[in-house]
Every structure is written in C-alpha cells, then in structure tokens.
Regions:
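Polar, enzyme-active/binding microenvironments
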Residues: 1-289
Length: 289
C-alpha cells in the first residue's frame, strides 16, 4: 500500500499468501502516501493503513486512517484520524483492535493510539512506549500481544530493542527482549506463535532473519537469511503458515514457512514497483489466531 521515494504512489497491490505468484492490482489509497507510510494492519474483513508522508507536497505528513474490505478490490476509504500527523508509524492488531504507535514529525513520538476496526472513528489514546524508540520498527502480533521491534532512537540511532503490549488492555509498553542485530525498517510478521523480522538496514541493508516466540519474553534467535536481494522498508504479509516479504526498493517477493527455520524462497515479482515504505497487511496474520 503506497510507498515510494521521492515520488510517492497511491497504488495498492495484493497477493494470495498461500499461492506463490506475482502481485495484482487492488486499487488506490485516497492520497499518495510516501516512503514512511508503513503502518499496515488488518482484521479478518478489513485492511487498514495509517499516517505516512507525501514527499511531492513539501514533505507533508498525514494523520489519515484508511480502510477497505479484503473481499473485494477497489479504492480505500476514509476511516478516521490519528491525533497527530506523522510518518514512520508502527502498527499491530488482533481481530478487533488496531494499535498505532510512535512515528515522527519531525521529532519522534512515543504515543500509542488505537481504533476499534469494526467502527469508523478517530484513534484514541492507548498508552506510551516505555522507551524513546519510536519510529520505523517491525510490527508483530498474536491475538494477545503486539510487539514493536527495533527501529530508530534519536539518541542511539538504530536499535535492537523489542517492546510489547497486551492489545486488549490499555497501558504502556514493556521490555520483551532484543533482536539479534540493530536495525531500522525491517519487514515483520508471523503467526499466533512465532514472530519474524527480516531485512532492514543499519546503515546498509542486511539479509538477516530472526524470530521470537511471542508468548515467551526473551531475545530473538537466528531464523535464516534472505536468499535473493534483501531490501529495507519493504512491506510484508502473513498467513498462519507463511510469511511473505517484499524487497522495498526492488521488485522481488520472497517467503518462508513460519514454523520451519531456513532461508527465503522465491514467491514472485512485484509488477508495479512501489518503492520503500509501502505498508502491508493481511486477513490471516498472527493477531487473528
């Protein structure tokens, strides 16, 4: 969804996660969101995107939340607004609630907000991140927990901290553990048991994939490597069995079987290259069980 630097696109593309192949046209966002529009999340019926930046309009940041039904292709619709305009936003969801965290404009935020995905409206305060890590991290969810992985800290640069929340309970995030490396803009996802972070940069692009067991606090472990061209700020999508990642500034899509450690396998091609910062969501991710 969206993406692209310096020329933002409003294009939305889709895949069927269990069927390797090239992406297809879905529709358009209401605005062409730029490179930092990587807040994507979903329920079983709707996909969402929130915030972002449109570089063609003098680095304009947005607070808009948009949605569309997964069952039919078409353009996204207005859902509501975040409390502030910002980009580099993180997000996670279970079947009922979507949480949007962090971002910057131009200074970083540590705020977290939420929406009830079945009811249009503006985001409401959820709590604060326990650390100043607040931008461009990876997003993972189970039906119970949401994880924010790595990202950027204004004092320390790229970081490896993983923090978590209980999605159904308002409050501040807590420390979960650490990723195997410091990185920003990873592609992230998983199922209800295991969360995966792949790619990203620090400062050059990395091909490392690591994973956590979402129910157990602790550090990430090695999963494998990105076999083809690794990218940064690429979108991702998950089913209960498969995690698909997109290159970011390239045209490749690769996947892994979530419960089987190993290197990525070719999935298909991105027909309409969207560039870095494209958001991703699915109706089969870990937050849905």
């Amino acid at each position: 969804m969206g993406g692209g630097y310096p020329n933002a696109t409003s294009t939305v593309r889709f895949i069927e996660v269990e069927k390797p192949g090239n992406d297809q046209s879905f529709g358009d966002l209401t605005d062409g969101l730029g490179k930092m529009s990587n807040a994507g999340f979903g329920s079983r019926t709707r996909g969402f995107t929130a915030g972002g930046r449109k570089y063609q309009s003098g680095n304009t940041d947005f607070n808009v939340i948009q949605e569309h039904e997964f069952a039919s292709t078409g353009n996204f619709n207005d859902f509501g607004d975040l409390s502030t305009t910002r980009n580099e936003v993180m997000s996670m969801s279970n079947a009922t609630r979507g949480v949007i965290a962090g971002g910057n404009n131009p200074s970083p935020f540590n705020i977290m907000e939420y929406i009830t995905m079945s009811s249009s409206g503006n985001a409401v305060d959820f709590g604060d991140q326990f650390t100043t890590i607040s931008t461009a991290g990876g997003n993972i969810a189970s039906p119970v927990r949401g994880l924010m992985c790595g990202g950027a800290n204004p004092n320390d640069g790229k970081v490896n901290t993983i923090q978590y929340i209980t999605i159904s309970t308002l409050g501040n995030s807590s420390d979960f553990g650490d990723m195997t490396i410091n990185r920003r803009f990873p592609s992230a996802g998983g199922n209800a048991v295991r969360g995966i972070n792949a790619q990203g940069n620090n400062p050059s692009v990395t091909n490392i994939i690591d994973f956590v067991t979402i129910a157990s606090l602790g550090d990430a472990q090695d999963f494998g490597d990105v076999s083809a061209d690794a990218g940064s700020s690429g979108g991702a999508a998950s089913s209960p069995t498969r995690f698909v990642m997109f290159e970011g500034d390239g045209t490749t899509a690769q996947y892994v079987q979530i419960m089987t450690k190993g290197n990525t396998i070719d999935f298909g091609d991105i027909q309409d290259r969207q560039g870095g910062g494209a958001g991703g969501c699915s109706n089969g991710h870990g937050g849905l069980g």
